[in-house]
Amino acid sequence: VIKFLEKLSKGTPQHWASGSFKVRDLLKRWPATRPIRLLYIELRNSLRGLPRWRALRGADARVWTSACSSAKGPKVLVASSVGAHMIANSLDSMLAVALTLRGARVHGLLCDGALPACLACEANLWPDQQHFTKHGPSRTLCGPCFRPARRMWSGFGLPIHFLSRHLADEDRAACWRIAQTVAEAEIDSYEHLGVRAGMHARSGALRYFARGTLDEEPHALSVRRRFLAAALMATSALDRLFTAEAFDACVAHHGLYVPQGLLVDLSRKHNVRMATWNVAYRAGSFIFSHDDTYHFTLMNEPVTNWESLVLDEPLQAALDDYMQSRATGSKDWVSYQDNTGFSTSEMKERYGIDLTKPTVSAFTNVLWDAQVFYPSNAFPSMLDWLFDTVRYFARRHDLQLVVRVHPAEVRNPVRSRQTVVDELARAFPQLPDNVHVIAPTAPVNSYALARHSNAAVIYGTKMGVELSYMGIPTIVAGESWARNKGVTLDADSRAAYFALLDKLPLSGGLDEETRRRAARYAFHFFFRRTIPFEFLTVRKGAWPPFRLELADLAPLRPGRSPGLDLVCDGITKGTPFIYAAETLIRQGRSSH
């Protein structure tokens, strides 16, 4: 049954598909299939999606009992919160066990249906949006989300907190009253108990709709108010929990959306050490950050963490080997690139691109992903940047602009409901002759395109790290992680951005010293900031993309995994989340 449901949910045979439309897309639009999809979510999480800690604990009963009874270390809240998120609950629960084995007093956190909206809510689960605006997830998603996670977390014997137990009826009423009456223009900036509830509610609503703007969503305002109510309730409940328990540290995935973003703000308010994490690029590895989401910390990380790194022959060889693999994603969790389209003649024939002409490539990012306020952005949004860029190049007949739309628009598990191709077609019914758009489904490799470019312009894509490593001069207008590293041309205003464009075409690529600096940062980012866990089995093309391969608790004990030891020390002691990959490589040991 679960295999059949998985086929319905995740994909269809090729002969069932026509273009980008698949049977699964029809199922997502058909209200009658929602019970099947919800049943699939619960069965998947219950039967094989989440670790079976009760059995593993039994295999090491004496060790586990002793660890729990003797734990006298820091009090740590592992705040998975969203039960349906299999990656979060799998990794968080592993961290809970590992921290306990190192003496920490670990508590868990789950939402038990207390919130009227959250990270688990996506528009494709509610083909009838009025049902969601009226009832939220309570009648459909909350049960399948909560039940499997509760069973998994109960296998520890550790304290676990439920949001509803820290939320009084009067809190709910007050939060709903605020959410329904606050002026529309004030929703995004609304603060509650010193927390940026409105900002995180906005991020949640954009993710729900999988859109970067909500102008054309008829139920957008109702959904925004629902997410604001959820953010207010989560803030009230978590503020009460933090006051009562006096945690020393907190662990939360993402550090964005509802309720995870609120945990970051509340940890800061209560002087609780916060560690956020997310899946990294390299297969089997994760990114951890202190005190904020990695979307902020990676932009503002001190350059002293990496600029003096010496890339000797073993390190340079490891970096070059990995960076070459990025074109196909063979060493990553997932690849958004096709190993096709390398021929310049093919690009010219299929897309009208003449790479003998000075070419500037614009690489987009997913419109809705991680949309929070970035003070250094030169434009209000990626679409504003892209539209103004096209208008600029319409006047520059000496140059050619190629817009490569991010393949994740259609390959991401949360498929975008607003696409760059559609928005460009709406804004420019007739594109300028020197502007070409490559759709996310097109068999063109972004790295091959970059190699033929005089320069690149980006907004928030993470590809800025690779572009600089490749020696491509890159102008950054948004929140790319390559910003502030001394390897890109960073614009903090529209005027500064266009002044940089006026210098195009450039006479050559990045100078040798800047390329060496870019290589040092690329090694730091891909090898030192991404932390591997050896006991994970990577499952490419599956969900979740990894499985904990544990016969007992031994691999999680201190001294067994350098990456796990590093992460646990970072959570409990505040030490940097920087993995000593260079040491392992120089010793001839694989770091990933």
Please provide the spans of the model-predicted regions.
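Conserved catalytic-core segment of nucleotide-activated headgroup transferases in glycan assembly
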Residues: A327-R426
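Nucleotide-sugar donor-binding patch of glycosyltransferase catalytic domains
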Residues: F288, I475-R520
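Histidine-anchored nucleotide/phosphate-binding helix
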Residues: H85-G108, D112, V264, F379-A394
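A short, glycine/small-residue-rich beta-strand->loop->alpha-helix junction that serves as a flexible
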Residues: S81-L91, A252, Q371-F373
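A donor-sugar binding/catalytic signature common to diverse glycosyltransferases
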Residues: P259, N278, S285, A442-L489
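Conserved nucleotide-sugar donor-interacting segment of glycosyltransferase catalytic cores
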Residues: A234-S289
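Donor nucleotide-activated moiety binding/catalytic core segment of transferases
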Residues: L228-A244, D354-L355, S376-N377, R415-V465, ...
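Conserved N-terminal ligand/cofactor-binding loop architecture of enzyme catalytic domains
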Residues: V1-K75, A79, A98, R102-A231, ...
